[in-house]
Amino acid sequence: MKLRSIELALPDAAKAAHFMVKTWGLADAGVQGDTYYLRGSGTFPYLVSFTESTDDFVRSTSFVCSDDELAALTTRVAASGFPARPVVSEDLGGGHGLIVELPDGELLRFLAGAQDVASLPGKPDMPVKLTHVVFNATDAEASGHVVEDVLGHEVRADRRDVR
């Protein structure tokens, strides 16, 4: 299972996308409707998306996995009783899978069958992929247990990093 992307909603999505291209070196991966996709030099179709919204929020954080990994995850989530629902991704790369809601409302999307793209010959400082995400939670212990016990990721105790 690999961390692929984070999907954000915010006002002035075009301006945010422009900033990420000019300042952080991400590449424009395209626009669908009011969603701007930005990619790195690796094989993921995008790393960050910005969707126009009047409010700021994280739409989801997405992971890609095999069908077997998705089946095992689906079984663990069902046994845990945590809110989850099936999803078919309409974002770049597609895929199908499961959205799991963590205790503080964070949405994690797990996709099988998502398509990769050709890597870009990037600049030396162009991002390749996301390496981590940080969640702020009112109950970090509860969120950490779900991430470890149900989702099968490692949470580092010193900074609570998901691996």
Give names to the regions the model predicted:
Residues 3, 57-61:
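Eukaryotic phosphotyrosine signaling hubs
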Residues 54:
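Conserved functional hotspot residues or short segments at active or partner-binding sites
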Residues 46-48, 84, 89, 106-112, ...:
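Intrinsic, low-complexity N-terminal interaction/targeting segments
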Residues 10-14, 33, 62-106, 137-148:
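Vicinal oxygen chelate
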Residues 2, 96, 129:
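Beta-rich catalytic cores
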Residues 2-45, 90-91, 135-163:
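Core segments of cupin and vicinal oxygen chelate
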Residues 39, 51, 101:
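Residue-level detector of conserved, well-ordered beta-strand and adjacent loop positions
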